[in-house]
């Protein structure tokens, strides 16, 4: 069994770092940020921008849940509800989850592999500003007519006959801009990882978070050209007289579904795999054990990426596909659960008999595992196409989608935030407030989405803006709405925590958690050039090796410090 440490004693330990200790630096002029090519500043701007979009998407979700809290509610019209639904889904997927990992990757990829910057710094800056510009244009549609065809924009609903406003064109413009931004970033990530690793950092010594970013980049390079072609064809249908998706003139709406979901299902793992990488970094640090099955986890990441390109048609089970095709995609959907299960069992094995230090980051990773397992189980139900025929377009699908994506992405984003915030800012977040945020979010999330399985089983369809009383949906919808507000309070606690810690947080030092990877070899926050001298990497845990070397040289055994410092941060 694991040993749990909840209130450890702070003990001073020798600090190991590449530079002299420096106090957190004040932010420079805004012009320096606008023109910067420093990967760390670009990473921070990604995180701030995506955090803003996350909050906006959350407000949109609360408005929709409020509308559905009681039958025959008149808070929103059907038109406004469809617009909010489209804005919420598009924001969370294209403006939050995918680019937030670009933010973490931009900041930590060079630090973790011993590089001084990304391979293409100017391209890096261009990627960020394309994302920002696309988001601004998309949200500018609030002032005339937002898109209302859903974040997937299925034709013929998204064709000019049914969506004549410029809002739908703004959606297409956003997909192009964010797609180009992500594609350029993915190329940058790939080249940096392949060519700029520290001496001795072979592929079997690469941090697991970097493995996940490598696969994230490869999937983006594979999937994004497909959706770019699809939205270009849709734009041509709307403005240039083509009929790719127009069923009245030999077009096929199902073609859009194939193109969109060939991108869309790899996109699910694009959003989740970096979160898996965060979990693989956080658990061994706070378990005080090496990761169990390093090679198996790295291999499982690659296998998931391969299988992710073979399961897209399970989103089309309700369309007219031959039984043999349905059977193939059902089996491939089952199969993709195997490498995911390998990861989960390896994480649990790492926790088992570890000396657990129950920080907020570790709580968020444990919460992720619990939530993601539930999402995976419901996914098995939906992978059986006769079952999917019954549950298709019901709230059961909504519940599954959020358990997988919010559990797999949002909870791991928060885990990464609490884990790496001291390195970014030089200050610790308040652990008491952080744990309160976790428990409120965890309870609110399950209250919001678990009951939606029951809504789906009782027949409530997706994408309806109101419903009649007496259908058995009212109580579940009210519970779900209350849960969504509780979830929002949990997020707000973390926002307050971040704001307070920027000025009042305890100084973190270079290695507050006693980490395993090279980013902890630098001061907090790191200097412009990251490293004066990059150490030779001799294992998958280079910082542990460096600490052992210092212990041998100084004769001082580090029996504490690191993560124990969090006890004073509250």
Describe the residue ranges of each PLM region.
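Membrane-embedded and interfacial regions of multi-pass energy-transducing membrane proteins
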Residues: 2-570
């Amino acid at each position: 069994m694991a040993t749990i440490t909840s209130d450890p004693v702070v003990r001073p330990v020798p600090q190991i770092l590449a530079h002299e200790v420096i106090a957190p630096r004040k932010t420079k002029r805004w012009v320096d940020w606008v023109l910067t090519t420093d990967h760390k500043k670009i990473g921070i701007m990604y995180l701030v921008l995506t955090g803003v979009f996350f909050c906006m998407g959350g407000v949109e979700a609360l408005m929709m849940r409020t509308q559905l809290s009681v039958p025959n509610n008149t808070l929103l019209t059907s038109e406004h509800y469809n617009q909010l639904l489209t804005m919420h889904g598009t924001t969370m997927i294209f403006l939050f989850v995918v680019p937030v990992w670009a933010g973490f990757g931009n900041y930590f990829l060079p630090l973790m592999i011993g590089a001084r910057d990304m391979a293409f710094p100017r391209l890096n800056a261009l990627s960020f500003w394309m994302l920002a510009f696309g988001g601004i244009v998309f949200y500018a549609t609030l002032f005339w007519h937002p898109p209302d065809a859903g974040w997937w924009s299925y034709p013929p609903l998204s064709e000019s006959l049914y969506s004549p406003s410029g809002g739908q064109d703004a959606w297409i413009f956003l997909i192009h801009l964010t797609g180009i931004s992500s594609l350029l970033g993915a190329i940058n990530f790939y080249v940096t990882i392949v060519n700029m690793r520290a001496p001795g950092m072979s592929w079997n010594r690469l941090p697991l978070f970097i493995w996940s970013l490598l696969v994230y980049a490869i999937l983006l390079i594979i999937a994004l050209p497909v959706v770019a072609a699809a939205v270009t064809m849709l734009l041509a249908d709307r403005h240039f007289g083509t009929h790719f998706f127009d069923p009245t003139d030999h077009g096929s709406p199902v073609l859009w579904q194939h193109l969109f979901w060939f991108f869309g299902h790899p996109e699910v793992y694009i959003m989740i795999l970096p979160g898996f990488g965060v979990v693989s970094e956080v658990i061994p640090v706070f378990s005080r054990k090496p990761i169990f099955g390093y090679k198996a986890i790295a291999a499982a990441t690659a296998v998931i990426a391969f299988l992710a390109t073979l399961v897209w048609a399970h989103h089309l089970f309700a369309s007219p596909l031959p039984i043999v095709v349905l059977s193939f995609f059902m089996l491939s959907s089952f199969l993709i659960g195997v490498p995911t299960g390998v990861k989960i069992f390896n994480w649990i094995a790492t926790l088992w008999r570890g000396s657990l230090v129950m920080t907020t980051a570790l709580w968020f990773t444990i919460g992720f595992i619990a939530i993601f397992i539930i999402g995976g189980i419901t996914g098995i139900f939906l992978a059986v196409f006769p079952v999917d025929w019954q549950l298709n377009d019901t709230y059961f699908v909504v519940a599954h989608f959020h358990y997988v994506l919010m559990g797999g992405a949002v909870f791991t984003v928060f885990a990464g935030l609490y884990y790496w915030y001291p390195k970014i800012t030089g200050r610790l977040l308040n652990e008491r407030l952080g744990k309160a945020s976790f428990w409120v979010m965890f309870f609110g999330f399950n209250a919001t989405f678990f009951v939606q399985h029951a809504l789906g089983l009782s027949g409530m369809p997706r994408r309806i803006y109101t419903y009649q009383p007496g259908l058995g949906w009212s109580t579940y919808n009210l519970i779900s709405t209350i849960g969504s507000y509780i979830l929002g309070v949990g997020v707000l606690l973390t926002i307050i925590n971040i704001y307070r810690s920027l000025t009042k947080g305890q100084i973190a030092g270079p290695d507050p958690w006693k980490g395993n990877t090279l980013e902890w070899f630098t001061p907090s926050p790191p200097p412009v050039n990251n490293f004066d001298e990059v150490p030779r990497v001799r294992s998958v845990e280079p910082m542990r090796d460096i600490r052992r070397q210092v212990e041998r040289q100084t004769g001082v055994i580090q029996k504490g410090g690191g993560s124990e410092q969090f006890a004073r941060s509250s």
